[in-house]
Amino acid sequence: LKEIDLKNFDLIIEPSAGNGGFSDFLYSFNMVALDIEPEKDYIIKQDWFTFDTSNHYRKVLVIGNPPFGLRNILSKRFIEHALKIENINTIAFVLPDVFNKHTNQKIFPKEWKLKQVIKLPRDSFTLDGEEYHVPCSFYIWTKDEVEKDLRFNPDEFITQDFEYIL
């Protein structure tokens, strides 16, 4: 979490808090943790897809490890809902490494910049009490100005150096 200056946000939301993987570390900030099946008392039983922030928050961070679902359908829905809420300006999610691909990054409109990608170590997850490997990274997307947008740009790899003859 040192990659994000948490003091810059009026509100921090963990939309799929589960057992508090992120929110346990964010408790000293103005934070809301949500889950449809909360595992801790401070986590609000709330469906992320029906949640909206108050308009009196200027800068909102959404952070967490959303469920991925088959072909990342659920993680994309979590992103899409965050993008609909106007005062959310940073989304920091653990996502499968397929989000390194341009086709998956296109979910973010042009005004969103990929600020940072932090590769998670092997066996960062547990399943039934056992370490479990899922190739994932922590992606930080923002509407703020960034030094360099790390979004994959396929145009950078187009060349005019070859002529194709069919």
PLM feature segments, named:
Residues 1-166:
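Class I S-adenosyl-L-methionine-dependent methyltransferase catalytic core
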